[in-house]
């Protein structure tokens, strides 16, 4: 790509950001790249089939108009998926896997391509009863906001699919902190997916998966367990961070591979991204990262207010006289910032106090009842990728330079500063930091940390730079 094309692309992105707004741009366009400009066509790419489909369906004309404002001669936008476009030709696959992927591309009729990996047996095994589902956790009760737009759209896409449809992204991996809505989305997928009766959607916690596998081994029914699991249309796994044990992880990996290769959908949730699941085998992490990985961010005040109103409406369905005044809702939304469960707990407390004491809800009552839920603002969670990006921009190098093996002075110092910040601003271990910096050994990270620690004590310029970087990352 030429410099002039890159400059044009930057202006188009700025125009697109202004047109759709910051939230929409971040959700759908932040990972879109320019590949080439040829004659009257512009070739763009995105990392997943889901993003490609969504942009084509909802924003194609807008992207084209932004390009035409920059280059009037452009009349066509070609959007492709980077992973499919840039990967080397794979080795010859087993027939089932090949046919399943043809179905994803639309090269063959889906009905002819969704052959199961094994002949499914009756789903009578204890583990296939699934984990309990909460009837309240549906799409209808899920409140959508800036923090969860992409995760909700992806989950809805899975739930609305039909048997025989090509799988757009696999697996769908959703990660977030406690109480931000992961389980709600996964159970909503399960409820909606099973509603039509056409597909079998199974929801399991990682703990239930482990229990089922161990029980099957003890009862010598492991083969039935495996066959039944691999006959599922959509497998939904919650709290993957709790998956332990080499044999259990190996079986999970085999199940994951078998379902994906057969064109079956897998949806997974955990409290961290795949790369941070250090207890999992590298093969599992790699497979998880190959799908659509979506983070659900912390709840903004508007979203917290929406959740509170939703919970009040749900409570009013059973207690018609229950009401929470707007000033009380505003106070709760401002004050309870930790997670959605605390918000629901606050409404439950107000309901109980109001009903048991036959008193209306007031601001004074709310302040008394939820005092323990009002917590100090948590510090911003800083990611190693954010550190690399900010440091690279500060020292005018690229992120790939920081991850490379280059040893030139203009790269070594920024890399050491980034490693130092990763150690001081995150909870990541030295081996994990080294792995995020191009697979370096933990001793290299330790050397960098000690080097910068020594220098900031005597080099005021470097100390000022490091402190400025910390402020940027923490703001």
Curated annotation (Swiss-Prot):
Database matches in NCBIfam families: DnaA
Subunit field text: Oligomerizes as a right-handed, spiral filament on DNA at oriC.
Record has ATP-binding as a keyword: yes
Keyword annotations from UniProtKB, A to Z: ATP-binding, Cytoplasm, DNA replication, DNA-binding, Lipid-binding, Nucleotide-binding
Spans annotated as Domain II: 73-131
One Pfam entry name: Bac_DnaA
Domain comment (free text): Domain I is involved in oligomerization and binding regulators, domain II is flexibile and of varying length in different bacteria, domain III forms the AAA+ region, while domain IV binds dsDNA.
Cellular component aspect of the GO annotation: cytoplasm; plasma membrane
Family: Belongs to the DnaA family.
Domain III, AAA+ region as annotated region, ranges: 132-354
Annotated compartments: Cytoplasm
Renumbered residue ranges of the record's region Domain IV, binds dsDNA: 355-475
One GO term (biological process): regulation of DNA replication
Stated role: Plays an essential role in the initiation and regulation of chromosomal replication. ATP-DnaA binds to the origin of replication (oriC) to initiate formation of the DNA replication initiation complex once per cell cycle. Binds the DnaA box (a 9 base pair repeat at the origin) and separates the double-stranded (ds)DNA. Forms a right-handed helical filament on oriC DNA; dsDNA binds to the exterior of the filament while single-stranded (ss)DNA is stabiized in the filament's interior.
Annotated ATP binding sites: 179, 181-183
Gene3D superfamilies linked: 1.10.1750.10, 1.10.8.60, 3.30.300.180, P-loop containing nucleotide triphosphate hydrolases
Organism field: Bradyrhizobium sp. (strain BTAi1 / ATCC BAA-1182)
Positions of region (Domain I, interacts with DnaA modulators): 1-73
InterPro entries per UniProt: AAA+_ATPase, Chromosome_initiator_DnaA, Chromosome_initiator_DnaA-like, Chromosome_initiator_DnaA_CS, DnaA_C, DnaA_dom, DnaA_N_dom, DnaA_N_sf
Protein name as annotated: Chromosomal replication initiator protein DnaA
Single GO MF descriptor: ATP hydrolysis activity
């Amino acid at each position: 790509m030429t410099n002039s094309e890159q400059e044009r692309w930057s202006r188009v992105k700025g125009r697109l950001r202004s047109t759709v707004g910051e939230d929409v741009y971040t959700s759908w366009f932040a990972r879109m790249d320019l590949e080439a400009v040829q004659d009257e066509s512009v070739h763009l790419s995105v990392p997943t089939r889901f993003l490609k489909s969504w942009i084509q369906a909802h924003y194609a004309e807008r992207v084209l108009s932004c390009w035409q404002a920059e280059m009037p001669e452009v009349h066509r936008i070609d959007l492709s998926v980077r992973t499919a476009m840039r990967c080397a030709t794979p080795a010859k696959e087993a027939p089932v896997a090949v046919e399943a992927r043809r179905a994803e591309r639309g090269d063959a009729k889906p009905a002819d391509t969704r052959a199961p990996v094994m002949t499914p047996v009756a789903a009578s095994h204890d583990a296939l009863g699934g984990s309990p589902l909460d009837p309240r956790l549906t799409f209808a009760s899920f409140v959508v906001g800036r923090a969860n737009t992409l995760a909700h759209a992806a989950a809805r896409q899975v739930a609305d699919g039909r048997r025989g449809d090509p799988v757009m992204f696999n697996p769908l991996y959703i990660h977030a902190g406690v109480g931000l809505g992961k389980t709600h989305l996964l159970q909503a997928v399960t409820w909606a997916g099973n509603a039509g009766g056409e597909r079998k959607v199974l929801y399991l916690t990682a703990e239930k998966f482990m229990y089922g596998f161990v029980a099957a081994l003890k009862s010598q029914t492991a083969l039935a367990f495996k066959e039944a699991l691999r006959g599922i249309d959509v497998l939904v796994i919650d709290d993957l961070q709790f998956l332990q044990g080499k044999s259990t992880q190996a079986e999970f990996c085999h199940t994951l591979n078998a379902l994906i290769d057969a064109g079956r959908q897998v949806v997974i949730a955990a409290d961290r991204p795949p790369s941070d699941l250090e207890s999992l085998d590298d093969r599992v992490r790699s497979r998880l990262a190959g799908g659509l990985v979506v983070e659900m961010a912390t709840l903004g005040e508007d979203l917290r207010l929406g959740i509170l109103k939703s919970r009040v409406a749900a409570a009013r369905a059973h207690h018609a006289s229950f009401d929470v005044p707007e000033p009380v809702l505003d106070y709760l939304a401002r004050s309870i910032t930790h997670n959605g469960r605390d918000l629901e707990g606050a409404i439950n407390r107000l309901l109980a106090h109001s009903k048991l004491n036959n008193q209306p809800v007031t601001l004074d009552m709310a302040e008394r009842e939820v005092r323990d839920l009002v917590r100090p603002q948590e510090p911003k969670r800083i990611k190693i990728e954010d550190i690399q990006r900010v440091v690279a921009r500060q020292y005018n190098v690229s992120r790939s330079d920081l991850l490379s093996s280059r040893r030139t002075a203009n790269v070594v110092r920024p890399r050491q500063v980034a490693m130092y910040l990763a150690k001081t601003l995150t909870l990541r271990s030295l081996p994990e930091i080294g792995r995020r910096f191009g697979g370096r050994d933990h001793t290299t990270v330790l050397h960098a940390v000690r080097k910068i620690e020594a220098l900031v004590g005597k080099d005021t310029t470097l100390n000022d730079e490091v402190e400025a970087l910390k402020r940027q990352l923490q703001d």
